[in-house]
């Protein structure tokens, strides 16, 4: 946050995981089901290891509540969430948060173009973050 802004206004720090208990959603991709909060925390953990600043990490409401899905049999809702994940989360990681660290962030796929990352996500799911991403990050969160 800009130092001039901090001097002029009061603000309260809210941790990146505050209120995550209010957000419940699942996402099915590449034949596996994942919890939204756990997957975003795993992504945050990987980003932190890559020394991405905390203000670039994903909060629980990075994806709007309207896309959250609790019914793993609701294919339409899941398709919408997968689409939002690709078009919002992956684009944010590719274009902004991990722009200088694409090789390490997307180590499980061809990261030369955003479209290649999206195609790989459709095929491999969260393995785009590395073959061991689910075991190294997701299962430890």
Task: Please annotate each region the language model reported.
Residues 1-141:
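C-terminal regulatory/interaction module of P-loop NTP-utilizing enzymes
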């Amino acid at each position: 946050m800009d130092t001039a802004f901090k001097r002029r206004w009061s603000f309260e720090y809210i941790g990146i995981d505050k209120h995550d208990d209010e957000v419940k959603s699942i996402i099915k991709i590449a034949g596996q089901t994942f919890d939204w909060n756990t997957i975003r925390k795993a992504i945050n953990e990987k980003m932190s290891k890559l020394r991405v600043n905390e203000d670039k990490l994903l909060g629980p409401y990075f994806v709007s509540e309207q896309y959250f899905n609790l019914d793993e049999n609701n294919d339409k809702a899941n398709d919408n969430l997968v689409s939002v994940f690709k078009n919002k989360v992956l684009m944010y990681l590719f274009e902004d948060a991990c722009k200088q660290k694409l090789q390490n962030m997307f180590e499980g796929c061809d990261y030369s173009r955003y479209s290649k990352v999206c195609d790989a996500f459709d095929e491999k799911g969260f393995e785009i973050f590395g073959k061991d991403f689910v075991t190294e990050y997701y299962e430890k969160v």
